[in-house]
Amino acid sequence: MRLPMQKLLIPTLLGLAMFAGSVNAAAPLRPPQGYFAPVEAFKTGDFKNDCDAMPPPYTGSLQFRSKYEGSDKARSTLNVQSEKAFRDSTADITKLEKDTSKRVMQFMRDGRPEQLECTLNWLTSWAKADALMSKDFNHTGKSMRKWALGSMASAYVRLKFSDSHPLANHQQESQLIEAWFNKLADQVVSDWDNLPLEKTNNHSYWAAWSVMATSVATNRRDLFDWAVKEYKVGVNQVDDQGFLPNELKRQQRALSYHNYALPPLSMIASFALVNGVDLRQENNSALKRLGDKVLAGVKDPEIFEKKNGKEQDMKDLKEDMKYAWLEPFCTLYTCAPDVIERKHGMQPFKTFRLGGDLTKVYDPTHEKGNKGS
């Protein structure tokens, strides 16, 4: 007796669907398409090699003063003296972050081997020294660790996935660097995992971004899953009006900190989406709600003043770079024409904590100028 064709097809299609699901779970992690861009040119001839003296690998205690030292629990009043102490004590770490980002951008533009070698030498030296791995840390110290990891790993992703394969002849350095990134990411997970909700704020989102960038750089599905978990915790804190209760506590800096929460969340959602995990609808599209609330607040800060009773400090929000999150955000959601117009007026967005030039990655047709951070 012959079975009808549709009865034969049902289990076959089910099997295919299950197979596709398992393949997706096992597929190597990847970044968004813009990270596959080739090096623009391979320039030759004389040039000024600006590979400075490498900052010495930071292997000391991660006990740093907070720039809000002495402030009340709102952590909203800057302490100029302690901020200077913080900047001084973390200068070598910040130089590594900024110069890695800058040099990767230069290499992707000019293709000079000296630019690549400088970056890899610095990262390899810090990796060999097990830098930034101290177990003696305070809140500011563990914050520096995850910021630095996010900066380095997200810049490195541009090298690793470029269609020009610049790391092909640098296997040994790549292995050392990636092993160090993995150790740092494991420590970041330990530093920030399972915090009580009242202590989960923008810091946790930035920690999750650093772990997401590392997961793609090193193909670690466990790190990817942790970043997704933390993202969900974060966007489930967004209320139905688009506010983050823990950032509203920052008084006159509430709007700034809502804005500061958006870059890591938007990048995580973007990286997750290309790996088959769609987070856009989480908590009724909470990320979209948060982004829209911030854009409305920038236009009319009284929205936030009415919510928490404090006139908002708009100083930070006058810098174009603070809106770099619009690049991934406007690929995840449909941005209104006035938002797109504003985005184009501020481009290119270059920010070292997200790995460099996001306009080059997400909106390359609008790449222009030499702005950057």
From Swiss-Prot:
Recorded GO CC terms: periplasmic space
Catalytic activity entry: Eliminative cleavage of alginate to give oligosaccharides with 4-deoxy-alpha-L-erythro-hex-4-enuronosyl groups at their non-reducing ends and beta-D-mannuronate at their reducing end
CDD domains: AlgLyase (cd00244)
Gene Ontology terms describing biological process: alginic acid catabolic process
Residues that coordinate or bind substrate: 66-67, 139-140, 257
Main location: periplasm
Top enzyme class: lyase
Signal peptide residues on this chain, from the entry's feature table: 1-25
Protein role: Catalyzes the depolymerization of alginate by cleaving the beta-1,4 glycosidic bond between two adjacent sugar residues via a beta-elimination mechanism. May serve to degrade mislocalized alginate that is trapped in the periplasmic space.
Family to which the UniProt record says this protein belongs: Belongs to the polysaccharide lyase 5 family.
Name under which the protein is recorded: Alginate lyase
